[in-house]
A protein has these predicted regions:
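Nucleotide/phosphate-binding catalytic cleft detector across ATP-hydrolyzing
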Residues: 1-121, 129-247, 253-301
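Acidic, divalent-metal-coordinating active-site segment for phosphoryl/phosphodiester hydrolysis
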Residues: 126
Length: 301
């Protein structure tokens, strides 16, 4: 967005590509952080942009909006989400727990009386939830998700290679090299950045093994969160989980070897959902399409 008048220039992937590359008169902003609103004004502008694209020539059209939110957010944060969406032009706002949306998008039978464990690893938070009868029986969240992993990669390169890189480059390293368990052949990658000593451009070669070690703390936090959730699960639901196992969704589910590591740590079946990146969006879409499901899992505020 432009600093002078706060006009929106780009949204989404196009805006993300500008991170760390904007001139002084343009500001790249993340409206949401750790699953909640970080900047109310910018959030409303972003939502208004989306709704305007939906409206097209129908200027009076005001959509019904369903939004997935972390199960751990407070009532104040829930109202902040509602207010921002209403100000952006929505007719009605319904909130749904993000793990429920992800479970629906992954095709889990959450309306049945049986335990389903979903581990939704997003950008800001990882949520582990036990879901039954279309509701969250138990949920635990931790800030050990994709953004935190990017930060760990930046920190590792700064400490061990005296190299400063941006968050986009860190994400590229994560996608290319990161893993939670040794898989396949040893991989290396050349990374460009700025030498913290000389202040000049510099290139270093890094390995998948050192990135796996750099992300060790983040992966361990996810494992501990899953264990806590399983320990709090009712015995009847625990029996279901032994058979059904754990389903991974969100971008973090694509971390190489994460399913193998979690199986090793929990001794439960673990699988990555089909299209884990979009499970949350697919689940919200199902709620909008199926009125009976919408009434069960989405709550107006």
């Amino acid at each position: 967005m432009r600093r002078a008048d706060h006009a929106v220039i780009a949204v989404g992937r196009e805006a993300k590509a500008m991170l760390g590359r904007t001139p002084g008169n343009i500001l790249a902003v993340r409206p949401l952080k750790d699953g909640v609103i970080a900047d109310v004004e910018v959030t409303e502008k972003m939502l208004g942009y989306f709704i305007k694209n939906l409206q097209g020539a129908r200027a009076l059209f005001r959509p019904r909006v369903v939004i997935g939110v972390p199960s751990s957010i407070t009532q104040v944060e829930r109202r902040a989400v509602r207010d921002s969406v209403m100000h952006a032009g929505a007719r009605t706002v319904y909130l749904i727990h993000a793990p429920v949306a992800a479970a629906l998008g992954a095709g889990l039978p959450i309306q049945e009386p049986g335990g389903n464990v979903i581990v939704d690893i997003g950008g800001g938070t990882t949520e582990v939830a036990v879901i039954s009868l279309a509701g969250v029986v138990y949920c635990n969240a931790v800030r050990g998700a994709g953004d935190a992993m990017d930060e760990k990669i930046v920190e590792h390169l700064r400490k061990h290679h005296n190299l400063l890189i941006g968050e986009l480059r860190a994400e590229e390293v994560k996608i290319a090299l990161a893993s939670a368990w040794p898989v396949g052949e040893r991989r290396t990658m050349e990374v460009n950045g700025r030498d913290l000593g000389a202040g000049l451009p510099k290139t270093v070669t890094i390995t998948d093994e050192e990135i796996r070690e750099a992300l060790g703390e983040s992966v361990t936090r996810i494992i501990e969160t899953i264990r806590t959730c399983l320990e709090q699960t009712l015995p009847e639901l625990a029996a279901d989980i032994v058979d059904k196992g754990i389903v991974l969704t969100g971008g973090g589910a694509l971390l190489r070897g994460l399913d193998l590591r979690l199986h090793h740590e929990t001794q439960l079946p673990v699988r990555v959902a089909d299209d884990p990146l979009v499970c949350g969006a697919l689940g919200v879409g199902k709620i909008l399409e199926e009125i009976d499901l919408w009434k069960k899992v989405a709550t107006p505020i």
